[in-house]
Amino acid sequence: MTISETWLLPDGVADVLPEQAQVIEKLRREAIDFLAVRGYQLVYTPFIEYIESLSSLSESNQDLDLVTFKVIDQLSGRLLGIRADMTPQVARIDAHVRPVEGVARYCYAGTVLHTKPQNFNATRAPLQLGAELYGHDSIEADVEMVYVMLGLIENAYTLQGAHLDLGHVGLFRSLVKYAGLSKNEEHELSDLYQRKALPELAEFTQNLNMGSDFYALGRYASDLDALQVHLSADILKDTEFDAALNALKITLEQIKNRWPALNVGIDVVELRSYHYHTGLMYAVYAPNRAAPLAQGGRYDGIGEHFGRARPATGFSCDLYALGANQFAEIETVVAPKGTEADLLKAIANARSEGLRVVQLLGNDDLSSIPYATHQLVLQNGQWNIEKI
């Protein structure tokens, strides 16, 4: 083994050095505090669990199973999974460990591990931060979660130039149910919508039951007013479809009232998480970034695997992505060596004010502290901090 092989890291894994680690940790602390004052209680979840627990979403989210590292437990011989997403762990807590009646709000922050990057240039070990609301199936709960997500991004990053995408899988799902489509037809439509293949969609829907409605859903996916004009009266009278459309309208209106300058887009056929989400979906993007800063949605029934299905909505983000290209310039005060009481008191006072103070050791001098910005000097019997 060469020396280089001992310090090389796997693809998609990187060290976080002090200048950026300080930024990331500040973001984490402020985000947790932001969520705490809104009633979201912090939970810590284990880094490994039996795969049966972590794969509770595998039937509805095959992608999660594919990115989960699996190892054999040397104690029990059972298969363990290294968490790739903390959502199923929080679902287990809500369903079994802490079965609260009524609304429960949780937040979390911790490293997750992926077998492969989730998008171009992404890390395989994101620092995932998220918030989840259990026990309330309402538009108000969805709107609260979008508000919390946007508020957090506004505090930690910025909403200037940001773009919010809104969607609702209930529109497509209820239309499929109303039309009585087969699984193959449903899968084909989902693929066409994802590829935005309008010519192919027009051809495919010609002989499809409710075909004009399925075409309208793709053709006017980003314009709710035009969509309503081109949908049939039958589907507009459907209770489930109407509820989904109404939820999307109300959410859009309330977000516009709260953040009038925010660029908000609608895409009713954004179905990447169709088999996982059950209602409203949302994602916020920064300019010149392909991957979302944060994303989430409704996923009712997530705790069913643990014996307690409950309405749920939530979002998550990667703190490394939020803190990318941000580097802290930390002021460092250098104190001379010595054990005099007044010197030690001056050092303690500076640290109590939040300053970073490094005391010289042995034969060290200022040149041995390359990141020093200030020094503690004795003047007229008083210790003062001076800029270097």
From Swiss-Prot:
Pathway: Amino-acid biosynthesis; L-histidine biosynthesis; L-histidine from 5-phospho-alpha-D-ribose 1-diphosphate: step 1/9. It holds the Pfam family tRNA-synt_His. Keywords: Amino-acid biosynthesis, Cytoplasm, Histidine biosynthesis. GO terms for cellular component: cytoplasm. NCBIfam families: PRK12292.1-1 (NF008935), PRK12421.1 (NF009086). Belongs to the class-II aminoacyl-tRNA synthetase family. HisZ subfamily. Required for the first step of histidine biosynthesis. May allow the feedback regulation of ATP phosphoribosyltransferase activity by histidine. This is ATP phosphoribosyltransferase regulatory subunit.
